[in-house]
Amino acid sequence: MSAAILESAAELFAERGPAATSIRDVAARARVNHGLVFRHFGNKEQLVAAVLNDQAANLSKLIDAGTALPEIAIAGTRQLRVLSRALLDGYPVAELQTSFPAAVRLLDEVRPQHDNEDTARLATAHAVALLLGWQLFEPFIRSAIGLPDLPEDALRQSIFTEMGRLSLPH
C-alpha cells in the first residue's frame, strides 16, 4: 500500500507539482482512503519528503542493477520533474530529501579527475545544473534555438556528453 501511495504521489507531483496536489488526490490515484496516506506519511510536506527520497532510491537501484539507459532516463526524468516542481512550489527540498545517491555517484566518478574536493564538487554541480536546466526548460530551449525535431535520444546523449565535459578539470 505504501508503494502505491508513493507511486501515485510521484506521478501527480511530476504532472502538476505538490502545491496543486492534495492528499485526497494522491489517495484517489492510489485507490486508498486519504486517512491511510496521513497514517503512513503524515502531512503533505512529509509525503513530499518520502516521495523525493523514494524517487532517489529507485533511480539508484536501477543504475545499480545495470538497467537499460532508456528506462533509467525515464526514471531520472520523473525524479527531476518531481524535484523541480517541489522546488518551484517552495518546498525546502534540501531539507526534505535526505539521500542524494545519483549526485553522490556522479561526484564519485568526477572526483578522481580533480586535484581537490572543491573543484570536483563544483564540476559536479555544473553538470547537475545543466541537467536540471534542460529538465525545466526543454520546450523553451528547443523552440528558441530551433531544435523542435531533434530526437529525444539524441538530445539525451548530447546532454550526457556535455555533462561529461563540464565534469573535466579546466
Functional labels for PLM-detected ranges:
Residues 1-4, 8-46:
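Helix-turn-helix
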Residues 44, 51, 55, 79, ...:
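Hydrophobic/aromatic residues within well-ordered alpha-helical segments
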Residues 46-74:
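Amphipathic alpha-helical linker/stalk segments
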Residues 60-63, 91-122:
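Amphipathic alpha-helical packing segments from all-alpha helical-bundle domains
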Residues 77, 81, 121-125:
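Non-catalytic, well-ordered alpha-helical scaffold segments
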Residues 78, 84, 91-92:
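Internal, conserved structured core segments that host functional sites
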Residues 83-87, 127, 131:
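Short alpha-helical scaffolding segments that buttress acidic/His motifs in well-ordered protein cores
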Residues 104-112, 136-170:
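C-terminal peripheral helix-coil segments that are non-catalytic and often amphipathic
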